[in-house]
C-alpha cells in the first residue's frame, strides 16, 4: 500500500491511527552532527546527517528538518538520493523502509519491500537511477523502484551482496565484491539469473558524498571542519566564494540516550550503555536540553585520561555547588563543573576498583551515583566485593563494609534512588537470576535486604525476575521496581516488614467473573516514572504504557506503529516535574510527549493557577489547559452567572477542557470561571478564561 502525505494535510492522512491532536503533542530530537551524504536538488539541498535528514533552501535560507513526528514514516535513514526524473528524494531506512520526499514536503511511503516476508537480508547498500526508476543495491541482489509512485517493479535475486549498480549501453551492471561484476541486458528477462553474465574483477565505487557539485547550478556543496553544511562557487581561477558560514539544525551531539534527568529547568541525558550482555562502547556524552538549544559536556580524550572515555551510565547534581556534576561511567567517576571536565576518579586516585582480573581502568564500573542532602556522594562500584562507597563533601573517601554486599559474590549493583518518604537509598543487584533489592540507611550505615532473588506476591506466588532495572516511588509511598517479570511494588507495609514481599497489581477483567490479571505480567519493564497525577509511565521492550493512578486502567500504549516513538525498545522515561512533558530514551534516540498532567501545587491561588490558550480565539479548536491546581482537585467551569458547563478532576496539577458545554456544544463567547476545590473541601475561583467566537 502506498500513502501520499503532504505537509499541509499530514495530520489527516495516516499510516496509522494517530489522532490529530496526539500527533501535535510529540517532538523528536534528532542529531545532525555527522554529515554523510549531500544531495543537491536545484535551489534545495538535502542532507543525511547522523541518520536524519534536513534540507537547506538557497533562495531564503530556510532550514527544514524531517522526522517521524512530521512527515517521515520511520527513523534511522541509511541513504538518500535525488531522482531528477520524478523530482523526489529517495530516502532509504536501515530497516529497508522507503520514503519518497519532494522539495515541497510531500511524502510517498513505499513500504512493500520493508513489509515483504523473506529470509534474505534486505539491507540496501546503494541507490542508482535510470530515468524514473531507482535500482536499489541490496545484500541479495537488486530491487527496481518506480520513484513516481513508490511501486516495486521487480526484485532480482542474484544470490550475492551487491555494492552498487549502474546502467550503461543498454545493460544493468551489478558490482559485487563476492562475485565480481554482473551484467544483464535491460531488454532481457532480468528475473532469470541465467541472463546475468559474470565478468572478472570488481571496481570499487569512488564517490565523495560529502563534496558534491550540482550540475544544474554549478555550486559545490560540502561540510565544514566542524560538521556543518556549506556551499560555494568556483570562478575561472578556481577561487572559492562561500555562500554561507555553515548550516546545522538544532540537535543533540548524537542519538545515544540511556538515562534522563531533570535539573533546574533543563533536561540532562547520558548516552552510554552497559550490561552483562551488552557492551556499548559508546562515546562519553552528557546531553543538555534547555527547551530551545542543545549543548553537551566537554569530552576528555583517552590521551588525557590514560584509558577510554566511554559509556556514561548515570549522573547526579551537587546540592551544595551549582553546576557541579558527577557522572558514573564504565571507566570511572567523572567530575564536571559548568560542563567542563575537572577530574576522573579511578583505581589510581580513589578506592574505586576495576572489575577485571587485569585491573583495567577501562572497567572501573561506577554504575550508580547519588548525592545525599548534605552533599556527600554515594557511589556504586559494580562487580567488585565492596561496591558501596562514599565521596564526602570534604573530598575524603569511605568504603562501606556491608556483609550483604560482600558475601560469596560480586554484584552488578545500579540505580541509586533516594526515597523522599523513607529517607533510604534504594538500589538493585541485576546479576542475572541472582537479583536483589536493597534499602540503605546512609545516615546510620545500615543495609536492609528488601528481597531477592525470589519474591512473594500478594497471592503468595513466587516470582524470580531474571533482571531488575530501576527503582522509584509513587505519591502513595509505594516503592516500584522495574523488572524482567513486569512492574512490582512494595507497599509501605511491605517496606516495613521486609522479607521479599511485593505486590503485582491485579487489574480486574470487569467481565462479571471477578477475575483479574497481573499488570504487565512478564513484560520486560525497564523503567517506571510517576507523573504529577500519580500515573505510571512504564518503559518496556514493547513500547511505553501509561497506567492510571489506581493502576486499573491502561490509558495509553505507545509503539512505533501508533506514534512517533523511534523504537519499541525504551530504556528510560522521565516525567519532567517542571512541565507536562514526558521524555523517552529509546534504542534509536530521544522523543517527548506533551501529557495532560503536571506537578500539583500544595495551595491554589490566582497567582499560580492559569489557563492557556487564553483568550481562546475563534480559530482554536483544541484543548484549553488549566495548570497550577492541587492534586486531585475538583474542577468546575461556569459562566459568569454560575451555569455549569464542564466539570471533572485534575490530573496532577492540570485540567483539560475542550471548550464545550455539558451537551458537547462549543460554548458561547464570554468569560468563564474556573472553580476548584481541594480534597479537604477548600474551594474558590482560581482563574478566568475568555472565549471569543
Model-derived features: where do they sit?
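Bacterial Sec-dependent N-terminal signal peptides
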Residues: 1-24, 171, 376-378, 693
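Carboxylate-rich, polar loop motifs that coordinate divalent cations or form catalytic acidic clusters
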Residues: 20-609, 644
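Short, conserved beta-strand segments of beta-strand-rich sandwich/propeller modules, principally
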Residues: 581, 668-673
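Glycine-centered coil/turn sites that cap beta-strands in beta-rich domains
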Residues: 603-636, 654-657
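Short, glycine-anchored, charge-dense loop/turn motifs used at functional sites
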Residues: 634-645, 664, 672
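Glycine-centered tight-turn motifs at strand-turn-strand junctions
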Residues: 644-667, 678-682
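C-terminal tail/sorting-segment detector
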Residues: 673-693
Amino acid at each position: 500500500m502506498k500513502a501520499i502525505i503532504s505537509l499541509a494535510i499530514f495530520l489527516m492522512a495516516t499510516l496509522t491511527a494517530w489522532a490529530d491532536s496526539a500527533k501535535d503533542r510529540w517532538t523528536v530530537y534528532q542529531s545532525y552532527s555527522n554529515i554523510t551524504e549531500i544531495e543537491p536538488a536545484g535551489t534545495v539541498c538535502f542532507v543525511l546527517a547522523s541518520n536524519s535528514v534536513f534540507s537547506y533552501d538557497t533562495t531564503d535560507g530556510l532550514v527544514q528538518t524531517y522526522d517521524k513526528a512530521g512527515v517521515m514514516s520511520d527513523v534511522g535513514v541509511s541513504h538518500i538520493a535525488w531522482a531528477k526524473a520524478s523530482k523526489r528524494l529517495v530516502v532509504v531506512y536501515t530497516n529497508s523502509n522507503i520514503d519518497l520526499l519532494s522539495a515541497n514536503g510531500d511524502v510517498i511511503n513505499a513500504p512493500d519491500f520493508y513489509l515483504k516476508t523473506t529470509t534474505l537480508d534486505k539491507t540496501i547498500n546503494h541507490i542508482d537511477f535510470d530515468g524514473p526508476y531507482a535500482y536499489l543495491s541490496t545484500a541479495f541482489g537488486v530491487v527496481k523502484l518506480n520513484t513516481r509512485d513508490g511501486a516495486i517493479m521487480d526484485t532480482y535475486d542474484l544470490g550475492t551482496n551487491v555494492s552498487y549498480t549502474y546502467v550503461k549501453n543498454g545493460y544493468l551492471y551489478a558490482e559485487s565484491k563476492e562475485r565480481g561484476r554482473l551484467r544483464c541486458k535491460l531488454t532481457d528477462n532480468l528475473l532469470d539469473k541465467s541472463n546475468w553474465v559474470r565478468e572478472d574483477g570488481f571496481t570499487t565505487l569512488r564517490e565523495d558524498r560529502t563534496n558534491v557539485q550540482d550540475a544544474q547550478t554549478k555550486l559545490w556543496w560540502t561540510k565544514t571542519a566542524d560538521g556543518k553544511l556549506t556551499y560555494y562557487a568556483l570562478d575561472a581561477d578556481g577561487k572559492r566564494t562561500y555562500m554561507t558560514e555553515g548550516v546545522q539544525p538544532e540537535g543533540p551531539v548524537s542519538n545515544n540516550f540511556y538515562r534522563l534527568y531533570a535539573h533546574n529547568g533543563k533536561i540532562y541525558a547520558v548516552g552510554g550503555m552497559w550490561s552483562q550482555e551488552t557492551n556499548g562502547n559508546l562515546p562519553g556524552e552528557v546531553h543538555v536540553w534547555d527547551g530551545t538549544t542543545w549543548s553537551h559536556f566537554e569530552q576528555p580524550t583517552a590521551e588525557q585520561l590514560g584509558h577510554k572515555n566511554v559509556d556514561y551510565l548515570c549522573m547526579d547534581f551537587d546540592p551544595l555547588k551549582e553546576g557541579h556534576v558527577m557522572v558514573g561511567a564504565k571507566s570511572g567517576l567523572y567530575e564536571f563543573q559548568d560542563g567542563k571536565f575537572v577530574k576522573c576518579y579511578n583505581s589510581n586516585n580513589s578506592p574505586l576498583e576495576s572489575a577485571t582480573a587485569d585491573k583495567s581502568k577501562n572497567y572501573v564500573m561506577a554504575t550508580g551515583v547519588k548525592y545525599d542532602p548534605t552533599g556527600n556522594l554515594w557511589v556504586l562500584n559494580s562487580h567488585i566485593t565492596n561496591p558501596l562507597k562514599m565521596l564526602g563533601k570534604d573530598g575524603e573517601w569511605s568504603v562501606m563494609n556491608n556483609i550483604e554486599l560482600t558475601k560469596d559474590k560480586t554484584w552488578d549493583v545500579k540505580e541509586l534512588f533516594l526515597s523522599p518518604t523513607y529517607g533510604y537509598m534504594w538500589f538493585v543487584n541485576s546479576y542475572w537470576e541472582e537479583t536483589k533489592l536493597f534499602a540503605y540507611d546512609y545516615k546510620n550505615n545500615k543495609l536492609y535486604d528488601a528481597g531477592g532473588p525470589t519474591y512473594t506476591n500478594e497471592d503468595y506466588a513466587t516470582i524470580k525476575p531474571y533482571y531488575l532495572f530501576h527503582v522509584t516511588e509513587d505519591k502513595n509511598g509505594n516503592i516500584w521496581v522495574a523488572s524482567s517479570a513486569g512492574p512490582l511494588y512494595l507497599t509501605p507495609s511491605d517496606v516495613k516488614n521486609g522479607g521479599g514481599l511485593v505486590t503485582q497489581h491485579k487489574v480486574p477483567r470487569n467481565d462479571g467473573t471477578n477475575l483479574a490479571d497481573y499488570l504487565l505480567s512478564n513484560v520486560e519493564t525497564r523503567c517506571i516514572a510517576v507523573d504529577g497525577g500519580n500515573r505510571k509511565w512504564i518503559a518496556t521492550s514493547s513500547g511505553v504504557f501509561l497506567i492510571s493512578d489506581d493502576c486499573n486502567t491502561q490509558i495509553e500504549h505507545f509503539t512505533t506503529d501508533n506514534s512517533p516513538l523511534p523504537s519499541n525498545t525504551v530504556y528510560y522515561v522521565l516525567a519532567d516535574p517542571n512541565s507536562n512533558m514526558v521524555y523517552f530514551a529509546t534504542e534509536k534516540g530521544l522523543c517527548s510527549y506533551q501529557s495532560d498532567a503536571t506537578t500539583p501545587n500544595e495551595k491554589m491561588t490566582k497567582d499560580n493557577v492559569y489557563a492557556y490558550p487564553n483568550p481562546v480565539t475563534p480559530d482554536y479548536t483544541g484543548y484549553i489547559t488549566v495548570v497550577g491546581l492541587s492534586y486531585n482537585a475538583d474542577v468546575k467551569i461556569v459562566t459568569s452567572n454560575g451555569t455549569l458547563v464542564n466539570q471533572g478532576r485534575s490530573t496532577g496539577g492540570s485540567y483539560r477542557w475542550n471548550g464545550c458545554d455539558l451537551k458537547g456544544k462549543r460554548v458561547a463567547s464570554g468569560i468563564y470561571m474556573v472553580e476548584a476545590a481541594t480534597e479537604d473541601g477548600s474551594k474558590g475561583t482560581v482563574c478566568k478564561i475568555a472565549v471569543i467566537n
